[in-house]
Each structure stands twice: as structure tokens, then as C-alpha cells.
Amino acid sequence: MKKMLWTAACALAMQGLVAAEHLEDKTAKAAEKVSDKPEIFLLGDSIRMGYCQDVKNELKDVADVRWPKENCANSQNTLIHLSWWKGIVSKPAVIQFNCGHWDVSRWDGDDEPITSLEEYGRNIRLIIRRLRRDYPGATVVFATTTTMNPNGTCGKNKRTTEDIRRYNAKAVEVARAEKVPVNDLFAFVEKWPSSDYADYAHFSKEANKRLGRHVAEFLKGQLKK
């Protein structure tokens, strides 16, 4: 029996090593720079996915704007996958990241958010420090999480604007302590009517263009510093 248990333990250990090596293999090398324009790197959830092309269009003459094709999801997922996304940029001048909608969500009817408030603050701090380590000289910007549709819909994974407000406050506290500029997207969209939303949290095409213009102007200002 002891021999069988030992064999099983060894097998599990080997699986762990293989999994770790698999993760290490995903670490990408920096991309080659293909433009003389400064690079801007956008990281974030589906809200970022909604406006990133508009940011690129707005800044086409002044910056090379890049982003991961996938949804960066919650703060822990973002932290874990930062090394995977190194191959997207070479030496970004500005990096804006956001995460929060997933973090505050009570997934599939859970009683608590996916990420506790304290865990969220810790993850934001670690993301900031990792980005600074991986991209020396880049200006790191934190973008706050946007509001829920004021009509009260919340989708399957419940979250509220009040939840978002609390988590934003924690993230901003961390960002300011780390001397990171904050792009307050929450404040920018807070008074938008329900007609600017496509569903419970995501924006219409026209609203995304407006949000993209705002993000572009903010990041353009960071390039000049």
C-alpha cells in the first residue's frame, strides 16, 4: 500500500512539474518594433475590447496601439498572463490596464465576489510592479472600472455599480501609493443614460467611440510627459 501511495505521489509531482514547464513555455519574447511611433499597450476586459480599435484609430498618426486579442478578465488572470502577452509589444511608452468587472462579479449566483476587496488591491499592486519590471521606462496607467447600466440589469453574474465604486476606491488608493496616473473611466461614463449601453455593462458602438476618444486623449497626454 505504501508503495502504491508513493507511486501516486510521484505521478502527481511529475504532473505538477510538467504543468509548470508548460506555463513557462508560454512566456513570450518581446515583439520586434515595426514603427517609429511610440507604442501604447492596452490591457483589460471586455470594456477595453469595446474601445481599443477606436483608440487605435484616434492615435494612428502618433502611436502604435496594441492589445491582447483575448479578454484579460479579472485581476488574477491578468497577473498570471502578463508574461504571455510580452510578445505583443517591444518597448511600450505607455501601458494602460483595467480589471474589475470580473473581480466584483458574484459568479453564477455566488454569495461573494470572485475577488475579495483586499485581494483586488493586492493584485492591482502586483500588476503595477510587474509591468514596471517588465517594461522599464514605460508609464503605467490604471483605468477605473466603468458603471453598470443604470436601468438595473446585471446579467447572470451579478454585480452593482456600488460594488464597482468600492473596488475602484481600493484600486485608486493602491495606484496613488504606487504613483500611477489614474484614468477615471467610471467618472467619465457615470452619468451616461441607459441608451448608451448595449446590455447590462457593455456600451453601444457610438458610446464606445466616445469612450475611445477619451482614452486616446488621456494616453496622448501621457506620451507628452
Where would I find each of the regions flagged by the language model?
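Serine-esterase "nucleophile elbow" of acetyl-processing enzymes
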Residues: 20-91, 95, 210
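General helical structural elements
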Residues: 6-7, 52
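Bacterial N-terminal signal peptides
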Residues: 7-16
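Residues that line or immediately flank small-molecule/substrate-binding pockets and catalytic motifs
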Residues: 8, 44, 99
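Alpha-helical cap/lid subdomain in secreted, periplasmic
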Residues: 2, 58-61, 79-225
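Compositionally biased, low-complexity repeat tracts
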Residues: 12, 35-36, 151
